[in-house]
A protein has these predicted regions:
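Iron-sulfur-associated redox domains of electron-transfer enzymes in respiratory
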Residues: 1-138
């Protein structure tokens, strides 16, 4: 993994089988691939859980944004265990409070409400990355 020292790592939960997990992964991809590819990089949580040396080293050398679908906070907890610095912990489940009655979709396909939640959370994550890159960590 190159350039991780300068880039913020975005680590979503795996969240297999849950719409919140799909939202977490889509938020990570939107931040890292679409909004701020020059400032961010994604890291697969499974590599970190497995103890992959390269993944652990990247976590220790980088600032991170974790994105968790549920209250188990797997991404957040594993980044902390690996010694990472967490700029922001985004919790998808909490976002549903701002979207009461939303019909986000399923574990495999997001509907319009789900994409709106992704967009809102990606804006939060991107804002955090930009603040950090300007030295104004929130």
């Amino acid at each position: 993994m190159k350039d991780t020292k300068e880039k913020v790592l975005v680590i979503p939960c795996s969240g297999i089988g849950k719409v919140q997990g799909l939202i977490a992964r889509e938020v990570a991809l939107q931040v890292a691939d679409e909004r701020l590819p020059e400032h961010t990089k994604t890291l697969c949580l499974a590599l970190l859980v497995k103890g992959d040396e390269e993944a652990v080293a990247a976590i220790k050398a980088s600032r991170c944004i974790t994105i968790d679908g549920c209250q188990k906070l797997c991404s957040n907890k594993n980044v902390e265990l690996a010694g990472g610095t967490i700029l922001r912990s985004i919790k998808v489940a909490e976002a549903f409070k701002d979207h009461k009655g939303a019909q986000p979709g399923t574990a495999t396909k997001l509907e319009t409400d789900g994409w709106q939640i992704v967009s809102d959370l990606a804006a939060t994550g991107a804002g955090e990355v930009m603040a950090a890159s300007e030295g104004k960590e929130q």
